[in-house]
Amino acid sequence: MADDATRKAVSDIPLLKTNSGPRDKELWVQRLREEYLALIKYVENNKVADNDWFRLESNKEGTRWFGKCWYIHDLMKYEFDVEFDIPVTYPTTAPEVAIPELDGKTAKMYRGGKICLTDHFKPLWARNVPKFGLAHLMALGLGPWLAVEIPDLISKGIVVHKEQQNN
């Protein structure tokens, strides 16, 4: 399914141990600590590999996440807001990542700008509960989705670089 670079990136992300979601207040704090450590490691590895492509932060409870993701195409940076909520059944249920400004612009997206991860990512997530976390969601979910969809949307003229919008 994944190319060698993706396999390498994912193998360098720490696996999570705590099987807890937001309903379990005490264990959720431990799970969040693991999530942050894995995300930090993934971002650090991406920076070393000159592949830095997102920033995330969460609300105080760790149940709502938001930030920016970007994709470089023909040496131009396309930046998008990204957001998702942690489902109450997390980690059994993967979060649904949304890029609101792309809502309705591709068939591989649900209402509200939620990207389609059903065919490839969700079965992989299900096989790896509770070891996979948000860093894995980014590496195996959003990253590949951006790599396929953004160049296609650019080639169709649906996504236009901000410098070209004013022309």
From Swiss-Prot:
Record has Phosphoprotein as a keyword: no
GO molecular function: UFM1 conjugating enzyme activity
A cellular component annotation (GO) from this entry: cytoplasm
BP-aspect Gene Ontology terms: protein K69-linked ufmylation; protein ufmylation; response to endoplasmic reticulum stress; reticulophagy
Keywords: Ubl conjugation pathway
Family: Belongs to the ubiquitin-conjugating enzyme family. UFC1 subfamily.
Protein name: Ubiquitin-fold modifier-conjugating enzyme 1
